[in-house]
Amino acid sequence: MEPIGILRTATNLRRMRNNGICLIMALTWGLTVMGQSSGEEKGTLPPLKDLGIVEAPKEVVLKGIEFDGNTVFSDEELFALVKERVGKKTGVEELEAIRKTISQHYFDAQYVNSGAVIDAQDMSNGVLVVRIVEGRLDNINILNEGWLRSGYVTSRIHREVSDPLNLDDLKRGLEFVRRDEKIRKINTALVPGDELGQSHLDMIVTENRVFDVGLGVSNRRPPSVGAEEAEVYFGTKNLTSLGDTLRGNYTLSQEGMEEWDVDDGGNYSLFYSLPLTRWDTTLDLGYNQSDYVILEEPFNTLDIESDTRMYSVGLRQPIYRDLQHELSLTLKGEHRRSDVLVSGEPFSISPGSVNGQTRISALRLSPEYVYRSQERVIAARTTFSFGLDELNPILGDEFDPEYFTWMTQASWVESVSENDTLLVVKLFHQHTDDRVVSMEQFSLGGVNTIRGYRENQLIRDNAFIISPELRFPVYKDRYGKALVYLIPFVDYGIGWNSNGPREREEIYSGGLGVTYNPTDHISMSLYWGHGFEDFGVRNNNDLQDDGIHFQLRLGTAFWDPTVNAVPEK
C-alpha cells in the first residue's frame, strides 16, 4: 500500500506561510505533478498583498487582544499563545510577530489555508483586534473525463471534509478515494480561490478497467456430483457509471475427467451492488442457482436430481470508518428453495423436506469489522440468522421455520518476517439450538474448511474450525512482490447436531500448498492434505480422496474509460 501523498513543495509552503495565509498545497501519489510548466509552478501563489497596520502608531502599550472569526480555537487558547505581548510597548514588528504566531498555530494543526489577519485599525486604546480567516474547500474540479460520475468521487471527499478545511481530513478523504476498487490513481492540487481562505481542489482521476472476464477449472465440488468443474466468470466495477458492481459466473460439472455434463450440471450466480449515498450505503441483490445430478456409484442408477435456488436482498452501511478500522452492518433477507427428484418424481431424501421440496426464508444481521495496517489485517464477521414463518415455508413437522443460527468467520494475517512471510489463521463457527435443514447446516471438509478431505465430508448443525498456515514467499518479481507462496497448514474441525445423536465428530488434517499469482487476473493453487480421520474411500479415482485440491483461473480486464489522464512513466 502506498503512503498518502505529501506536500509537493514544503519550501513554498513555508515561504507563503510567512507571508500570510497558506493557500496552496499539492497532494500526489508518487506520480508526476499535475500541470507543471516552465517558470513558477502552477498553483503557487505570489505573496499576499501587504495587510499591515495602516493607522497604528510607531509604538503603543498593548492592553488587550481580541479575536474575531475563530471557531476552531477558543479566544482563551489563542490568547495564551501571545499573552506575553500584553503590557509591553508594541510596534509593527511585534504585531506582525503576533499574526505569525497565531497563523503558525493554525498551520501546525493542519488548517493550511487558515490564519490571522490584522486589518487597518485605530489602536490608540491599546486593544488589538485580530481577524481569523478560517479556510474552506469551495469546489472540487475533476479535470479529465471518465466513465465514473464525478459526483461519486467528489461526494466522498466532501464526506470527510468540513469547514474550516483541515489537511488531515482532506488526505483521509483522498485516501478513501484512492482505495476504491474503481480507481487506479489520482493526482490532486489544492489551489487558492479569489478570496482569502477560499480553496479549490483540482483532480485528475484515472479509473481501473471497467470489465473483467475469465475462465477457471477446479475440483471444488463434492465428488458425488462431479468434483471437477469449468467456470466462466465476469464482472464490472462500474456498470452504469454510478459505481455499481455486477458479478456473475456460470459453471459446468464433469463426470470424472471424461464427459462434461452440460444439460444437468449448469450452475450460475449473479450479484449486484448499488451505492445509494456518499456514506457508502449499498443495496445488494443476489441470485444463485445450483442444479446437481448424483454421479457417484451406486446412487447414479437412481437418477437423483437436485435443484436449489437462492434469492437475497440486503442493505450494507459502514457505521465507523477511518484509514485503519471499519465497522459495518448488513441486513439481508434471503429465501432458499430446494427440489429433489428421483427418476423424475419428487422424493424426500434430505431431512426436513416434504415431497422432495424445502422452502425457507431468513433475516440475517451481520456486523463486520476490518483492521488494516502494514503488519497485519484482521477481519471478522458474525451473522445472526432468524428464520421467518411468513413466506410459506415448506418444512417437515420436526423442523421449526423460526429457527436461529449464529455463525462467525474471522481471519488474521500477520507479517512475521522481513521477507514477507505471512502467518494466516482462519476461524469458523456456527451454533444453533435448533435442528436446521441441510441448506442452513455447516459443512466440514474441502479446500475452504478442512483440506485433505472431500468437500462436504461432514454436514452438521454446529461446527467449529481453526486453520493456521504459514505462507513462505519462494519467488518474487523484480519489484519485490511475492508471486509464489509455499504454504504448510494444519486444519482442525469439530461438528455436532442439535437434536438426535449429539456425538461430536472431529476432523483434522495437515499438508502443503502452493499458490502462484503472476497478475491480478491469473491465479493457480494446489493443495495436498493428509486427513487423520478415515471416513472410507468411496471412489479411488477422485483426487479429493487423495487429499488433492486444485484451481486455475485465467482472466483479463478491458475497457479503460479514462480520458486525458496523466500518462504512466
Q: Where are each of the predicted segments found?
A:
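Periplasmic polypeptide-binding modules associated with outer-membrane biogenesis and secretion
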Residues: 36-221, 227, 233, 249-266, ...
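Membrane-embedded beta-strand positions of outer-membrane beta-barrel proteins
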Residues: 213-217, 234, 246-250, 283-287, ...
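C-terminal beta-signal and terminal closure region of outer-membrane beta-barrel proteins
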Residues: 502-569
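Gram-negative/organellar outer-membrane beta-barrel architecture
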Residues: 147-151, 163-370, 531, 540-562
